[in-house]
Structure formats: C-alpha cells, structure tokens
Amino acid sequence: MMKGGIAGLMKQAQQMQENMKKMQDQLASVEVEGQSGAGMVKVLMTCKYDVRRVTIDDSVMDDKEMLEDLLAAAVNDAVRRVETTTQEKMAGFTSGLNLPPGMKLPF
C-alpha cells in the first residue's frame, strides 16, 4: 500500500512538472508593456523578461539624462507587469500547493 502511495505521488509530481513547463512555454509568448513619462518611453517585454521593443518619443531625445531615467523607469514598470501577469496566470496552477506567502513561481 505504501508503494502505491509513493507511485501516485511521483506521478502527480511528474504531471505537475509537465504542467509547469507548458505554463512557462505559454508565458514566453505573453507580452506586457511598461511605460514612463506618460508614455514617452515604452518597453515591450515578454514574460520571460526578453525585451522585444523600445519606443522613445522624439521629444525626449535631446535630454540624455532624462531619457536614461525614463528608460530605466519603463523597464522597471515592464518587469513589475511581468511579475504581476505571471502570478495571475500561475494562480490557478499553484492554488492547491500551499506555498508560503511571497513565494514566486516559476522558481
């Protein structure tokens, strides 16, 4: 009886691993947009943290220091949006796992 329980747990763990891989593959194609300066700088990023596109309004091209700040802020905004989107999409998957508060998936 003990062997059956362990085998069941192993099968469940394998299914969970396969589902996690599928979710990660799906998240790789999800894109979010971070912005700063009321949309003067935009960063399009996948949920795998790959930057796909950076859009910069012509009006900020002459001020290098401001542009650097706006670019950093837009990237940080995109990263926060990736984390939020990932947590939302993983919520259903992780609901039965009893993870400690603040633990983020995928690891």
Curated annotation (Swiss-Prot):
SUPFAM superfamilies: YbaB-like
GO cellular component, one term: cytosol
Pfam families: YbaB_DNA_bd
Coiled coil ranges: none
Record bears the keyword Cytoplasm: yes
Domain of life: Bacteria
Keywords: Cytoplasm, DNA-binding
Subunit structure: Homodimer.
Listed HAMAP family: DNA_YbaB_EbfC (MF_00274)
Entry protein name: Nucleoid-associated protein AZOSEA06390
